[in-house]
Amino acid sequence: MKKWMLAICLMFINGICEAADCFDLAGRDYKIDPDLLRAISWKESRYRVNAIGINPVTGYGSGLMQVDSQHFNELARYGIKPEHLTTDPCMNIYTGAYYLAIAFKKWGVSWEAVGAYNAGFRKTERQNQRRLAYASEVYRIYTWIKSSKGIRVPTTKKSLSQINSVQKN
């Protein structure tokens, strides 16, 4: 179902994105806090649309959300080419949100799942440490984004869903 949603969203994305913030749109469509998507994008690319990052294990990451080249075969089934990810910011943000939603579905809405966006799902101590380090940095960026908007984020080790519910009250 989510794969069909991704395909449909991506077909209409170009026209929509000219008038709205793609982080907000992708967040709405995937039920992910747009500021979390912004934090991940800052961590991954410093908001550089055409960023290319080398990944010694799987190849390279592309664009704002550093979508990994290991996903290119799957994305090709939806008509998404690697060059789209570095030239179409909205497509890149939606694609990153799609893969984050997969992590949330697999591990729940948690910081561990945020870490898996970057470090994968392998259950080894090394990957656990990589997930923790990545999620900690994203959390720091996320709290900075929220504080710049006057929103206080709890400093306890709450899950993302608990933090999001606090912010909506």
UniProtKB/Swiss-Prot annotation:
Gene3D superfamilies: 1.10.530.10. Belongs to the IagB/IpgF/P19 family. It comes from Escherichia coli. InterPro entries: Lysozyme-like_dom_sf, Transglycosylase_SLT_dom_1. The gene is X. Coiled coil: none annotated. The keyword Membrane does not apply. The keyword Hydrolase does not apply. It holds the Pfam family SLT. This is X polypeptide. Keywords: Plasmid.
